[in-house]
């Protein structure tokens, strides 16, 4: 299992990642880190806002400074905070996958839609980001059409 952490503790993106990782066959979520005012709280302390069941795992929120001993970091941080922390963690050797817009136009940080092209990450450093969410509903069907045209 690949040990993972989530940056961001209570928002919709963080909750979605928590849900997706709970029973994943490859990834083991071992840490959720958040803002200083949330450090020490449990993930169960936050209102669950998604339309599916809350994960059974309950994590004590750690400081962003304490993220360690993981191979992959899934970031759900606001862009201004992500700009600082994602770069720092990537420089420390962690593989960072971001949902923030901070690095979407930075050379050497690929924007990926894994459903379309997971090979886009090959040859890059250990930092990648997701596209803007409005792109996905258009890009994936267009990709499927081009692949089967």
Where are these regions (language model features)?
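N-terminal Rossmann-like NAD(P) cofactor-binding subdomain of oxidoreductases
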Residues: 1-149
